[in-house]
Amino acid sequence: MNNITGHTGLTALLGSPVAHSISPLMHNESFRLLGLDYVYLCFDVNEETLPAAVAGLKTCGIRGFNLTMPNKNKIVELLDELSPEAQLIGAVNTVLNDNGKLIGYNTDGYGFMQSVRDAGHDITGKNITVMGVGGASMAICAQSALDGAASVHIFARRTSRYWNRTQKFAENLSAKTGCQVCLFDNDDHTALRDSIAQSYLLINATSVGMVPDIDDTIIKDTSLFHPELVVADVVYEPQETRLLREAKAAGCQTFNGMYMLLHQGAKAFQIWTGQEMPISVIKEKYFSVK
């Protein structure tokens, strides 16, 4: 890490929990490699404390920050401007402080689709099942539709406070892209079975299975897995969740959220600094399979 001076620019991650995050490693190493006078820190901030945290960071002149669970939706109402993709998604994971104006972006969809390509897959014309309706889910759904998926089926609890918003999101995304985007109740087991049976890709876009709850999984019935299915998990700690472990045992190809994190972070880095993250070096140092 570079020596911190009175001129050092601040960037950060706001979420809860954040102690497990490798974002500080990748960003601080990138700043060092490129000779940029910035530092990246993590702050444990939830939805209740987010408004005060953002106000304080803005006052202190932060250059930019990332949002992770559970803050990607709540942050929207605290910003001055949204990029086109953030407007479409309704969630933000990256904020730029442009001379006191906070501008929200969403690099999650971009990051996820880059990770799909890294894993050797192409979703063009394919059916996709997505679990969850949080900020990461909306970004992934939007990018999947924009990148040519035939259908995107979203599953969530009908009692979720985001249900109505997601219903409108699905209708709007379908109208804008021509992709069939539909919302289903998690408890509709028949719909879930049918959707996964017809899907090329199943994505867990929730925090289920993340440390410390590593024995939990979003898919309880392993008979839903089939060998033609690719299973992705946005969780990367642990690197192999129970979902991925059981899917692999059923003959599925699997990949986790590590490369999504890498690519969305690289995009955020470029937004803040105007420079490209040295991805190959960062990938080798921090994202090699353990």
Name these PLM-found stretches.
Residues 179-254:
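Rossmann-like adenosine-cofactor binding region
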Residues 149-177:
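NAD(P)-binding Rossmann-fold cofactor-contacting core
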Residues 146-151, 250-253:
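Conserved S-adenosyl-L-methionine
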Residues 15, 104-109, 125-149, 161:
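Glycine-rich adenosine-cofactor-binding loop
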Residues 3-119:
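Phosphate/diphosphate ligand-binding glycine-rich loop within oxidoreductases
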Residues 4-7, 123-124, 146, 219-228:
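Short, conserved loop/helix-junction motifs that constitute active-site signature segments
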Residues 228-230, 234-290:
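Adenosine-phosphate binding glycine-rich loop
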